[in-house]
């Protein structure tokens, strides 16, 4: 088989949800946008529901429809992008809860689905999604008559607990939501770890569920093993890959593995990246190609059948570091060509 195998440990995923749930005294939801961070939303969300999650968040309404088909009736599914033009039928038919981000969305929702649940997203300083203070004041009286199912905001710097922006956003959120009776939510994974001041009525862990930072106590959820297509001897002075970026200075044994930037192993990893055969770390040589990567396996006593990129020796965040990026980008980029194997 020439397809890399992405093994997803559902028991670890569920354990991470339970661990994050134990860190607060409030309801713990689960963020499963981007196909559950690339791991397969139907299977992942079902495991999280079995662990106890009853509220899920997705990025767009289409993701919510797919999730509803996987989970069936019952769990609440909230949509971060709110009520976009053209989403009305999806929201209604799949029983989704749009997180209203603007006055225009508020008007659209009330006119199209006057009896349908909605939430509110407020901007407390990130300047991304949500109503600013003036907008919120303009619609607050109307919006809270229902009341909304949830009022939320999102922290910009929760991965840096000491950053002054966290307290600034907390204070802003408290001020903007004074005297409302609706449940409130501010914390994703990083906010959960900053303590009860940030927890309010519901937390929304995402990356921590899948084994990523800043949740350092997370169990690893993914393992990526890539098959070796071919192994060859390379002599001193010979080069490997596009643009001759790596030249052998001694006799070398080079394996070509079946994955590349089309599979989410981004080109920026380059020669910083390492793979493993057992406990032996092996360097990438030459450029990462669309479908192929060269690895120096000279240190091994025999040619390997496969090499491991993500697993017990290096996490998603370690691999992200090879490319000076974040674990989120690597995880959500892991491509459709991988064979996904789920274990319990």
Swiss-Prot record:
Database matches in NCBIfam families: alr
SMART domains (alphabetical): Ala_racemase_C
HAMAP family: Ala_racemase
Residues that bind substrate: 128, 290
Task performed by this protein: Catalyzes the interconversion of L-alanine and D-alanine. May also act on other amino acids.
Keyword list, A-Z: Isomerase, Pyridoxal phosphate
Protein name, per record: Alanine racemase
Superkingdom of origin organism: Bacteria
Residue list for modification N6-(pyridoxal phosphate)lysine: 33
EC number from the UniProt entry: 5.1.1.1
InterPro entries for this protein: Ala_racemase, Ala_racemase/Decarboxylase_C, Ala_racemase_C, Ala_racemase_N, Ala_racemase_pyridoxalP-BS, PLP-binding_barrel
Lineage of origin: Bacteria, Pseudomonadati, Pseudomonadota, Alphaproteobacteria, Rhodobacterales
Gene Ontology molecular-function annotations: alanine racemase activity; pyridoxal phosphate binding
Pathway: Amino-acid biosynthesis; D-alanine biosynthesis; D-alanine from L-alanine: step 1/1
Catalytic activity: L-alanine = D-alanine
GO BP, sorted A to Z: D-alanine biosynthetic process
EC main group: isomerase
Cofactor: pyridoxal 5'-phosphate
Active site: 33 (proton acceptor), 242 (proton acceptor)
Gene3D superfamilies in alphabetical order: Alanine racemase, Lyase, Ornithine Decarboxylase, Chain A, domain 1
Gene Ontology terms: cellular component: cytosol
Family in the record: Belongs to the alanine racemase family.
């Amino acid at each position: 088989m020439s397809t890399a195998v992405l093994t997803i440990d559902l028991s670890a995923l569920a354990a991470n949800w339970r661990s994050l749930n134990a860190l607060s005294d409030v309801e713990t939801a689960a963020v499963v946008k981007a196909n559950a961070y690339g791991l397969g939303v139907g299977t992942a969300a079902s495991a999280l529901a079995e662990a106890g999650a009853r509220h899920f968040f997705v990025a767009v309404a289409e993701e919510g429809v797919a999730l509803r088909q996987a989970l069936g009736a019952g769990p609440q599914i909230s949509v971060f992008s709110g009520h976009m033009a053209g989403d009305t039928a999806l929201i209604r038919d799949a029983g989704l809860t749009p997180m209203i981000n603007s006055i225009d969305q508020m008007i659209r929702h009330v006119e199209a689905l006057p009896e349908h649940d909605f939430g509110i997203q407020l901007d407390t300083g990130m300047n991304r999604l949500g109503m600013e203070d003036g907008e919120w004041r303009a619609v607050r009286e109307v919006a809270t008559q229902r009341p909304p199912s949830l009022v939320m905001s999102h922290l910009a710097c929760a991965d840096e607990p000491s950053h002054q922006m966290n307290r600034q956003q907390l204070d802003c959120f408290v001020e903007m939501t004074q005297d409302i009776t609706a449940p409130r939510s501010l914390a994703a994974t990083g906010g959960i770890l900053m303590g009860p001041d940030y927890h309010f009525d519901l937390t929304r862990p995402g990356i921590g569920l899948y084994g990523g930072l800043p949740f350092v106590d997370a169990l690893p959820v993914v393992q990526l093993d890539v098959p070796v297509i071919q192994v060859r001897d390379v002599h001193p002075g010979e080069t490997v890959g596009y643009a001759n970026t790596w030249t052998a200075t001694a006799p070398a044994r080079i394996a070509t593995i079946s994955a590349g930037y089309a599979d989410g192993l981004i080109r920026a990893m380059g020669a910083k990246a390492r793979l493993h055969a057992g406990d032996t770390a092996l360097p990438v040589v030459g450029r990462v190609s669309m479908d192929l990567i060269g690895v120096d396996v000279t240190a091994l006593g025999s040619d390997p059948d496969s090499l491991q990129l993500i697993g017990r020796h290096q996490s998603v965040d370690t691999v992200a570091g090879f490319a000076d990026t974040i674990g989120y980008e690597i995880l959500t980029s892991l491509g459709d060509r991988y064979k996904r194997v789920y274990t319990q």
